[in-house]
Amino acid sequence: MIVDFKELRIPLIHPTYPPYHTGKYMEEYFYEFYLNNKKEFDQTGFTLIPIFWTNVYIMEGKGANKRRLIQPYLNALPQGKYFTVSQHDDAVAEQLPEGTLSFEGGGNGKGIPLPLICSKMPTKPTINKKDIFCSFVGSASHPIRDTIRETYINDSDFQLYMKPWTHAIPDAQLNFFIDITNRSKFSLSPRGYGAQSFRFYEILQLNSIPVIVYDKKWFPFEDEIDYESFSVLIHADEICNLKNILNNISDKQQKDMLKRGKDLIGMYKYTK
């Protein structure tokens, strides 16, 4: 069997998500980067499995009927050293060749964590004085988010706006998220369907302190990055203590965390 992964690099015909994103998605961008730097990659001894996982997974529900090809193609690969890159929450669900390095942005798999990123937000923070202690604007897409709402919905220090998840996000809703986040000292970044959220990197861009609420530890490059220097890490079991934890962070600490967050923003991008 000739393995032609071109069949698994299909275009994505789907509402843009997040709505401000422009250009390629992670797998598409990395494939181009790989081709442009193939000599350097070849020196590592590893070969890319060039599947646009996100496109194939999403388009399966739109009648593309390509996902059925993935496992036979993987099974037909000659023995060797491989790696792959994926963004979709559920990738990679198929059985990869033994020893394959799977770099994953979604967080529902068991691979090597990658940041879940896209292009920059089309706005810069304009508010320096924060009039909101802690906020969340987003979808009710995981029990952790439900628990946060149930715990703090009646607390005036929290502004929580949750709705059912939808593919399309109107401009008014995006602008509301930007405004509320920019005005917040702390902005909640609880996991949704996937272990990661675009929200974490959006919060950094909007000059707020991310509060990562997690049940599964999924922190990309944690051997290189001190997450607690610019964000607050809250396990799901600690949601009831979340406010006390935030209240114990001094104004000086908050200022230092915001500065550190700004310093790190440049690491979380793959488009200009």
What residue spans do the PLM features occupy?
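C-terminal helix of von Willebrand factor
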Residues: N244-I245
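Nucleotide-sugar donor-binding catalytic core of glycosyltransferases
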Residues: M1-Y201, Q205-L206, I212-I234, C240, ...
